[in-house]
């Protein structure tokens, strides 16, 4: 694959020129809620550019995985319809943090263009900012003046935000020839098809103030980005990015599955392009820990998947098919991104599960669309509200809704639709911006020289000094008895909450007073805050104090943290390499571990995992902790690391028997210190994410003892020895099953008899029979049984509506015969319409739906409403 060669040679070029190769960050920034997805190579270096973070290197090079499908940078709707828009792409880049600037950046870019990209220099053009005389002069060393163009802020000025670091930029373009347009220069090429931009060099040299003033930065930086797919297309001389390399390989797989030949210019060509791009985006997102959902990034992923499925229908796919394309992606990109291979099973399972769910939704949406068409007959227009619901809830693309409407000589209220869509986008945008924790905001005003040194790995007590006091609404110098606040120490043995481990508790004291520490946090970089309450006396800044961690709780936390590591490894060994940690929490009482897995764990699997962890505990191997250069361990398949954590140049490698992880937390001295491990709960957190809760040591033993006590009590109640409990319980359950069968038979007979009498009560309108019937509360327990039995007796052209009461609410069930469903009648839509005036809610399918409401009209009124509804809809 040309992309693999280009990527490798680009990184080698800069590595040979003293750039540190930095691995791609995930496709979404864990610690930056200001953007939905990673959309540029500079995202992971943002805090370095802002001066908030230091690194040991001043030069870096990356190939960054990017997604542009939400927020400010959103190419989703363009994908498939243009020659170069993608939701997923790779951005090659080189970066300088106060090292070299324009001269070397331009020199490097020219050399790479010729020696790595192998471009003909006679076809290269450059643009610079109209005020950037320095860049213009530098390009004159390589290009004739008539191939260097000065442009305005709109095209050649870059800024991270309204204020802060910014600067001029310079773009490199390649002339693809007259085949792509008659323009003779980039200035005439409005669409950018002939003179294709392939690299952008950003020179961060200013700091923009709130009044717009540009001040010179003390540390000037360089940030460049070149789209890999665009480079591959240029070198392959293809019309679009889809006709070359990885994307063409994926399109070939779609050709094979659909048995349709791809033609870029035919109408179905867009479907091939959409599917190829979207499968790649989804696969990388799932690999990095994202899952389709209903909010924020998950919502965007679900939109991408549903868009791929809808375009798949144009190629004849009416079943889940996306997972079948994944092996072709791994075949082409698995070597560069081995994490794709490890996550293959999970990617396929997530895609298939989502597709199955969506196909069911589409069936309901299609039925609903036909119903909407019927209900809008008098206006010959689909309302914007209905169109938005069909798109947002049921995933029907607006162009498909419009086409179906046109087939029936209907129009769509697009103005209202677009208004509702904009409102939904605004809600989504607001949801992505996390509000700063009010209780932490005051810490931003703490003197930046008041930093804390953590010494708690080696000691649980130390003599130190109070550097600062915070009372949550103000910076203070004293704390009096009974007051709550936070104390900042010069050195501290207290571990601050991070990496899923709870912060330490304990005491800070001297002769003047005692402060009880309830928890410890890091409200901003370099600052450790000890939160709590002054129990007696008074304390003030500069005082000499003793900081004492609660030793018993620290030991329990450390044991649980090591237990969490063992659990994580046991999950991987027992369930497969697709297991990825999705979150964790450890305190003195429990372990909570979230992990990627698509189904509930069986009792046998849980027992296997628990047994394996306890085996490792009994081995009593030392827990070793060593420091290492992150660059030395970042690509190790043996050492677990998590994208949610920000790693520095030096990292801690924690090894506990078969488990090896990068971790900054506190741990047991040996696995035997944990004592005993017990799983207490396993359940789903969200689609594709499971959670195990567990505990260790005395807490685990207490659970075991409590369960043993319960068994003794059960044995006494059912009058059986403990060793015969299982046999006795099975006998009891068999007896219960027999009794249940007898009861069911009696109930069935009762229902059959009552249904026969109801047949004479059915009414008829427009050749459709219907029944509205009120069941007693006792009969209402079998409401579904009544409906199913009656519809067996009247299998066609029949609608039944049943009402009963439960817990001071009306329970309503609507059942529709299959032939009416095929005509577009939807039980849920009918029930929604019926309950809406009374504030009721419902759920279900086209054939049957059930809901409830606090209010409901008399049964006679319901009969009239249903009769009128049938008269209108089935005229």
UniProtKB/Swiss-Prot annotation:
Cellular component terms per the entry's GO annotation: cytosol
Chief place of localization: cytoplasm
Catalytic reactions of this protein: tRNA(Ala) + L-alanine + ATP = L-alanyl-tRNA(Ala) + AMP + diphosphate
Intrachain disulfide bonds: none
EC class (word): ligase
Binding-site residues, Zn(2+): 561, 565, 663, 667
Entry cofactors: Zn(2+)
Note on how the cofactor is bound: Binds 1 zinc ion per subunit.
Keyword Ribosomal protein: no
SUPFAM superfamilies membership: Class II aaRS and biotin synthetases, Putative anticodon-binding domain of alanyl-tRNA synthetase (AlaRS), ThrRS/AlaRS common domain, Translation proteins
Subcellular location: Cytoplasm
Chain positions covered by the region annotation Disordered: 426-445
A molecular-function term among this protein's GO annotations: alanine-tRNA ligase activity
Keywords: Aminoacyl-tRNA synthetase, ATP-binding, Cytoplasm, Ligase, Metal-binding, Nucleotide-binding, Protein biosynthesis, RNA-binding, tRNA-binding, Zinc
Entry EC number(s): 6.1.1.7
Family: Belongs to the class-II aminoacyl-tRNA synthetase family.
Domain notes: Consists of three domains; the N-terminal catalytic domain, the editing domain and the C-terminal C-Ala domain. The editing domain removes incorrectly charged amino acids, while the C-Ala domain, along with tRNA(Ala), serves as a bridge to cooperatively bring together the editing and aminoacylation centers thus stimulating deacylation of misacylated tRNAs.
Task performed by this protein: Catalyzes the attachment of alanine to tRNA(Ala) in a two-step reaction: alanine is first activated by ATP to form Ala-AMP and then transferred to the acceptor end of tRNA(Ala). Also edits incorrectly charged Ser-tRNA(Ala) and Gly-tRNA(Ala) via its editing domain.
Protein name: Alanine--tRNA ligase
Species, as recorded: Chlamydia muridarum (strain MoPn / Nigg)
Gene: alaS
